[in-house]
Each structure stands twice: as structure tokens, then as C-alpha cells.
């Protein structure tokens, strides 16, 4: 919209506002919404939804049109609903800051002419035929749903997300009924747990042993949520849980186990961790339990899209309630990345008697799409809230005492009886662990102190730097830390590999080289808070690529070509036909002689999967990636690049997630002082009704 149009809208508002007897007209409200869209405060999609409602029902009250646009905007930012009680006191907090006086005036004038009382908004919503009152009306396909309209916290939903949220709550409640999957020999279970978790003299697992408690809780139920920070042993615990289920199964040879994660990278890490842990445990238990056979039977971990059978071009899956998964135990890692719609589909596709184990860090970033399911499920995780019956069960089966501080003082929530929070980190200590803890606790001063005081170089702060200085972390790199120099060194081996692989019987040289390039690339990553701008993913990808071309590490034509040898890419759209999924990382490399055709190679566990570059349309260069996309990955050195003007994207969870991607070294790039403190003070809050739907479900143990 032009500046003249902005002024015309303001004049129209001023004329309306000058006569208090004239109510705000729907057409005027739509004009204001379009102005907010052109200001960047709303998306065109948001306004289009309100416009459709206005077109189909011209009598719709202006406040309903505004609520509809705001609801669409909230969903686009990861919320599953619009919390109406929070809308009136702080409307601008939902939109973000206005750009310029004209937009600020439109916002202020619009809000001044909308009903000041929540009751008036609710009355208008109830009067709209497009809105279903969840507690009163029959479902007639209305696109909007008003939930808890008579409570102090009413919420407005798009119909699809209301249905997903209700489905997840229903499935979770059903799985929390404590109906044993099988009869349990508690004495045998206790014996196996004692062998799987032998007492450690230094108390390395903590007191009580929450890993052991998690296994005991999982043994009796069809749902277990295991949360904890990095290094607390979530997959270590899950592997021992699998061994326990095998040892106590009536017919162990028929136990069907599946592993899954939201991304291919996370799935591969889950499988590797489970296999390694079970292999070590096999040596510990000897011939009494055949864990090697279990490893072979489990097979490869899969992405959730692959597991459920994503149908190309649709939001539907081939696995659902009418055609459930053929599985007895499903372990899902990186559950914080699972959005509301995916969780609903997953729960629907599970057989009622199957066990579901969710692993994840509740403090990480939630999924990009709507919902913060793991966070909602873990609302009581830190407090414990265990019933007396649950504490008795844990003591009987695991020999562990749950302290009174972790027991419920009143009615015990049912979900809490199926949730375990691992509290002792064995791997994630030192400055990186201290930094993550300070950020997670909202202590910006301590976080800065850790960054500035680390003598071993494991953490570092680049303050007041330029994008060029951030690029130097990638090439040539920070002293003593991984960078893309390792990846460039492996790329440079191609001429020798090409010559060797051309010889009969030495074709395996090419595959070994591809693996070495992929592994070297995964040692470092630039992580960005935003996508656009010099400090964003796009700008830094371009700058790193240019630096590598200038250094001779990439071919000279890389700057002008869509594809070149060495280009790392991230898949941005699921393509089951090609066997690639959103978030997969691959590198374009020459195929084995004599072809020499560029193909993108992906590591899928121990195997390599390749796709011709001409068939990959939905990819983006991946020298730098957003923190959201990095979830499920781990790098020897991770560099987190903050950006001014990031608004709500710059959050505590974003910084925590970036830090916890680092295994050995972490660098924070802060273009201007104060960005870290701003982020740490700003925790992410996702509007959702899932937690409320689960409250009040008491567990009887």
C-alpha cells in the first residue's frame, strides 16, 4: 500500500472516530487489516482469511474479522490458538512493533474503535455463524472454534488445530489409564534393572537414579515421556528400556520395535546410539539375553514422515487408525520438534496396545509449525508430582526411592506418572554445560561471565563483530576448533580418489571418500537466528561460499552456478519418491568413475543414498542454517549468530538450542552488545490449550 493509501485509511479512521455514534464498519476494519499487512505486521494470508469471512458473511462484526486475522498470524508463528483474554490488554504484543508513525496510528485507531470488554468480543464470536462454540454447538464444519468461552481463558482456534489438539489430548489420556500391556514379573524386572544399572561408586547417575526410574515407569504403561538436557542419557536409557522389555516379554522373539525421529539426521543418530549402547550392554549381560538379535530386528530408524507413509502432495499418511503401524514399541527421539498435527497423526496410527516412548529436551525450541507438544506434556516434569502408588511401584521394581519433594501434595496428574526427567548430565559439563544452564535459568549475567572466563577455549564470544568476522569462524576457523577447513581438505582429495576408484576392484574408494566429506562437513556449522539479511542464513551462506571460492576450496564457477562439486544442501520439502525428507543434509559430489555426474549424497546410517542434482528442486545451500533446522544435529564446533531486529525469534530457547548443538566448542557471535541478554530475558510462550486439556486427570498409580 502506498503512503497515500495509508493516509487515506487514517483519514477514514479519523472521520469514523470523530463521531462516536458511528460504529466501526467491517469494510473499514478490512482496510485497516490491509494496511497492517503492508506494514509487515500481518501476512497476506492472515488478511485473506478475514477477507473470505467478510465476503461470505458481510454482517460479521469487525472485532471478529480482526480476531480471525490475528488467529491466522498466531498460527503462522507456531501458536495453536488465539488467547482472547491476552488480546485486549496487549494487542501490539501479538503483532509486533509498528513500523513508523502511520502504522502505529492505524493500530491505535483501530483498537480504540473495537469493543473494550472481552465479553463483547465473545458475544460477537458466538453470534458469527462461522464460529462453533466447542462446549455447546454441534460440529457443522465451522472453520473457527471458540473453546472455554465461559472460562477466564477463552481461546479461538482454526478448526483443524482444534481437532488436532483434542485428538492428542484424547489419545494421551487413554494411554495414561495404567492398564498393563502384559502381566509383569516384578522380581524378574528388578533383577534385570539391577544388572542394566549397576550401582556406581561416584553416584554418576545421581540419587535417585532417574534413568532406572524411567525404565520402571515405562514397564507398566503404554506411554512414557523421558525428558532431559544434553548428556543426561535419554537414548542410553531408551536402549536399556528395550533390553528390559525384551527380557520381560512373554514371547521376546516376536517383539516388534521401531525407531523414529522428525529428521533423517536425528533418526540416524538415534539408531547409532541405540546400537552402540545395546552392543556394550550385550557384553555386560552375556548369553543371558540376545541383544544382538534385537539390534538386527529393529532395523534402521526412520523419519516420522517415512514411518507413517507420507502421501506426496498431501497432508495425509498411509498409516492411520484404520491401518495402524505394525509395532509393539515405538521410540521417538527429538520429540520437541514434533508439531501438533504430526503428533496427532502419530498417535492415531499407533495400535492401542503398543508402547510409545517420547525422548526430548523440553527446554529446546518447539517445532516451527503449530504446537509445543513436548513442552505441554512435560508441564509437571521438573516437579515430579508422583502419586504414592507410583512411588511404591518404583521402589518395588527399581529399588529407587522417590523423595517427598517429587511427590504430589494433592491429586497426582495422570500424565506425570508416565513422565521422567533425567537430571544428571554426564557428558555436558564444563563451560558449554555451564553456559547452557545459565541461559536456561534466564541468567544473562552468568552466561556472559562464562563466555568471557573460559580459559580452555571451549566457549568464546565475538562481540561487536561484522559478518566477515563470523565467516572467518567457518573459514579459516577459530584456533583449535573445527571449521570448514576439514571439509575443504577432504574435497581436495577428489583427484586422487578419482584415479584410484577408476581401477578395477577399487570402486569402494569413492564411497569411502564421500563418507569422509560428509563427516568432515558435519564437524562445524554456522547457526542463525533469522533467515534473511547479512546476519541471516541467506547472507552468511553467500558469504561463506564466496570465501571458500576465493580460497580455492570450491570451484570458481560456484558463485554463478546453481550446482557445483562440494555444494552442501538441505532438503526443504519431503519427497518420499526420492527418499529425501525436510531437514536432510547432503553434499553434491561427482559420482564414481566413469560417470562423473554430479549427485547429492546423503548419509543414511551406514549406507549412502544419492540423488541426481537435476531431480532436487527443493533444497537450499547449507553452510549456514537456522537454529530451528539444526535440531537433532550435533557439531564439534557450533557458532551461533544473533541478529538485531529479530523480535520474538530471538528467544531463550533459541540460544539454549544453539549452545546444545555444540559438542566440543561453541562461539557466540553478538553483532551488538545486549542481544544475548535480550534473548535470555525472552522465553518462548506458545499459546495452546493442550496443557489445560490434560489437567485434572488424576493417576491412581
Mark where each language-model region is.
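N-terminal accessory nucleic-acid engagement/regulatory domains that precede
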Residues: 3-16, 23-185
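C-terminal accessory regions
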Residues: 531, 584-701
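Conserved helicase motor core of P-loop NTPases
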Residues: 363, 367-569, 575-577
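ASCE P-loop NTPase helicase motor core
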Residues: 213-215, 219-453
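Residue-level recognition of short, solvent-exposed, well-ordered loop/turn junctions
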Residues: 351, 562-565, 581, 630
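N-terminal pre-Walker A segment at the start of P-loop NTPase domains
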Residues: 186-209
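Short, charged beta-turn/beta-strand-edge "cap" motif at the junction between a beta-strand
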Residues: 573-578, 644-646
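Pre-Walker A adenine-sensing motif
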Residues: 203-219, 513-514
Amino acid at each position: 500500500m502506498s503512503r497515500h493509501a495509508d493516509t487515506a485509511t487514517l483519514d477514514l479512521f479519523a472521520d469514523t472516530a470523530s463521531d462516536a455514534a458511528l460504529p466501526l464498519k467491517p469494510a473499514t476494519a478490512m482496510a485497516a487489516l490491509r494496511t497492517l499487512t503492508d506494514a509487515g505486521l500481518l501476512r497476506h494470508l492472515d488478511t485473506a482469511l478475514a477477507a473470505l469471512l467478510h465476503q461470505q458473511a458481510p454482517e460479521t462484526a469487525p472485532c471478529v474479522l480482526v480476531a480471525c486475522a490475528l488467529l491466522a498470524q498466531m498460527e503462522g508463528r507456531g501458536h495453536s490458538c488465539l488467547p482472547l483474554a491476552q488480546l485486549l490488554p496487549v494487542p501490539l504484543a501479538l503483532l509486533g512493533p509498528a513500523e513508523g508513525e502511520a502504522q502505529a496510528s492505524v493500530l491505535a485507531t483501530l483498537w480504540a474503535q473495537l469493543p473494550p470488554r472481552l465479553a463483547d468480543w465473545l458475544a460477537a464470536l458466538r453470534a458469527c455463524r462461522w464460529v462453533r462454540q466447542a462446549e455447546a454447538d454441534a460440529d457443522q464444519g465451522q472453520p473457527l472454534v471458540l473453546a472455554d468461552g465461559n472460562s477466564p481463558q477463552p481461546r479461538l482456534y482454526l478448526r483443524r488445530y482444534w481437532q488436532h489438539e483434542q485428538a492428542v489430548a484424547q489419545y494421551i489420556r487413554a494411554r495414561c489409564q495404567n492398564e498393563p500391556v502384559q502381566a509383569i514379573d516384578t522380581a524378574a524386572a528388578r533383577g534385570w534393572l539391577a544388572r542394566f544399572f549397576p550401582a556406581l561408586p561416584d553416584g554418576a547417575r545421581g540419587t535417585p537414579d532417574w534413568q532406572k526410574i524411567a525404565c520402571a515407569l515405562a514397564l507398566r504403561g503404554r506411554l512414557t515421556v523421558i525428558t532431559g538436557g544434553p548428556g543426561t542419557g535419554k537414548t542410553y536409557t531408551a536402549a536399556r528400556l528395550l533390553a528390559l522389555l525384551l527380557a520381560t516379554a512373554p514371547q521376546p522373539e516376536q517383539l516388534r520395535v521401531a525407531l523414529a525421529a522428525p529428521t533423517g539426521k536425528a533418526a540416524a543418530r538415534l539408531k547409532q546410539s541405540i546400537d552402540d549402547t545395546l552392543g556394550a550392554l550385550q557384553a555386560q549381560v552375556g548369553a543371558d539375553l540376545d541383544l544382538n538379535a534385537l539390534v538386527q530386528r529393529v532395523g534402521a530408524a526412520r523419519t516420522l514422515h517415512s514411518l507413517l507413509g507420507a502421501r506426496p502432495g498431501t497432508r495425509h499418511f498411509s498409516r492411520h487408525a484404520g491401518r495402524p503401524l505394525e509395532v509393539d514399541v515405538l521410540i521417538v527421539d527429538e520429540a520437541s520438534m514434533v508439531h501438533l498435527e504430526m503428533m496427532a497423526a502419530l498417535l492415531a496410527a499407533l495400535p492401542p496396545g503398543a508402547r510409545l516412548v517420547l525422548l526430548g529436551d523440553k527446554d529446546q525450541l518447539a517445532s516451527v509449525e503449530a504446537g509445543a507438544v513436548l513442552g505441554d506434556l512435560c508441564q509437571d516434569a521438573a516437579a515430579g508430582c508422583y502419586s504414592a502408588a507410583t512411588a511404591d511401584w518404583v521402589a518395588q521394581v527399581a529399588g529407587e526411592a522417590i523423595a517427598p519433594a517429587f511427590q504430589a501434595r494433592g491429586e497426582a496428574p495422570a500424565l506425570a506418572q508416565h513422565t521422567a526427567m533425567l537430571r544428571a548430565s554426564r557428558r555436558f559439563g564444563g563451560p558449554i554445560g555451564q553456559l547452557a544452564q545459565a541461559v536456561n535459568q534466564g541468567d544473562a549475567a552468568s552466561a556472559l561471565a562464562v563466555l568471557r572466563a573460559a580459559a580452555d577455549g571451549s566457549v568464546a564470544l565475538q562481540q561487536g563483530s561484522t559478518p566477515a568476522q563470523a565467516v572467518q569462524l567457518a573459514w579459516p576457523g577459530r584456533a583449535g576448533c573445527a571449521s570448514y577447513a576439514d571439509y575443504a581438505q577432504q574435497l581436495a582429495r577428489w583427484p586422487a580418489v578419482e584415479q584410484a576408484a577408476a581401477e578395477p576392484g577399487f570402486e569402494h574408494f569413492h564411497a569411502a571418500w564421500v563418507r569422509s566429506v560428509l563427516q568432515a562437513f558435519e564437524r562445524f556449522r554456522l547457526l542463525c537466528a533469522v533467515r534473511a539479511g547479512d546476519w541471516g542464513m541467506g547472507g552468511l551462506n553467500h558469504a561463506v561460499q564466496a570465501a571458500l571460492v576465493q580460497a580455492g576450496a570450491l570451484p570458481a564457477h560456484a558463485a554463478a552456478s546453481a550446482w557445483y562439486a562440494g555444494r552442501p544442501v538441505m532438503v526443504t520439502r519431503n519427497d518420499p519418491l526420492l527418499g529425501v525428507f525436510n531437514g536432510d543434509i547432503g553434499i553434491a559430489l561427482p559420482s564414481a568413475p566413469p560417470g562423473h555426474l554430479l549427485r547429492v549424497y546423503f548419509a543414511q546410517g551406514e549406507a549412502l543414498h544419492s540423488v541426481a542434482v537435476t531431480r532436487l528442486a527443493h533444497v537450499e545451500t547449507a553452510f549456514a542454517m537456522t537454529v530451528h533446522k539444526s535440531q537433532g544435529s550435533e557439531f564439534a564446533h557450533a557458532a551461533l549468530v544473533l541478529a538485531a531486529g529479530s523480535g520474538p525469534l530471538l528467544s531463550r530457547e533459541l540460544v539454549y538450542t544453539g549452545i546444545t548443538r555444540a559438542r566440543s566448542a561453541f562461539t557466540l557471535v553478538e553483532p551488538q552488545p545486549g542481544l544475548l541478554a535480550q534473548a535470555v530475558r525472552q522465553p518462548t510462550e506458545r499459546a495452546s490449550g493442550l496443557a489445560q486439556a490434560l489437567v485434572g486427570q488424576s493417576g491412581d498409580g
